[in-house]
């Protein structure tokens, strides 16, 4: 029903807000301010919950909403953290530019995803949309995994460059 769908979206967004706050807290407290570590966790977990959602279409509605909500919990963390991670790597000399570039990619991605989701759903059905979400999540996880050993910021590297000049 329309009411059930509206509540599902509302629960998804509420969990997304809570998850975004948690991602910031976990970045500082668990991952010692290494935002790329939390982004990797978020990408893996969001993809996992989307896989569960698609793999078990006959699950009870309450469980279905809970699985989607947990996907929402993890889905916005990277969006919130990527600007901070970029700014930290660029140091104070380029932090605003780095954050701006990351933000532009986020907004362009949001625009095309909204358009793309509708087109995919119309042409191939909603399962395809979720498969694409999982694939994009996997690509994001791979990208963040390649950064695992990166330092929390670029300040040490910047000091070395200045001393070498």
Language-model segment annotations:
Residues 29-43:
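Cytoplasmic membrane-interface "Motif A"-like loop-to-helix N-cap segments
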Residues 20-33, 121-122:
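Helix-to-loop junctions at the C-terminal end of transmembrane segments
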Residues 53-57, 126, 132-165:
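Multi-pass alpha-helical transporter architecture, strongest
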Residues 61-77:
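Hydrophobic core of transmembrane alpha-helices in multi-pass small-molecule transporters
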Residues 92-123:
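A late C-terminal transmembrane helix in Major Facilitator Superfamily
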């Amino acid at each position: 029903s329309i009411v059930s769908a509206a509540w599902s979206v509302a629960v998804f967004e509420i969990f997304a807000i809570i998850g975004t706050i948690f991602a910031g807290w976990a970045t500082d407290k668990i991952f010692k301010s290494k935002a790329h570590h939390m982004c990797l966790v978020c990408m893996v977990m969001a993809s996992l919950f989307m896989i569960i959602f698609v793999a078990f279409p006959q699950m009870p509605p309450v469980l279905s909403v809970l699985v989607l909500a947990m996907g929402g919990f993890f889905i916005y963390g990277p969006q919130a953290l990527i600007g901070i991670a970029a700014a930290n790597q660029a140091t104070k000399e380029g932090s605003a530019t780095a954050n701006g570039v990351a933000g532009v990619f986020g907004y362009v991605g949001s625009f095309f995803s909204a358009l793309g989701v509708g087109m995919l759903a119309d042409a191939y059905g909603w399962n395809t949309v979720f498969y694409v979400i999982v694939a994009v999540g996997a690509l994001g996880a791979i990208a963040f995994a390649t950064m695992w050993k990166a330092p929390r910021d670029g300040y040490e590297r910047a000091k070395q460059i200045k001393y070498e000049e």
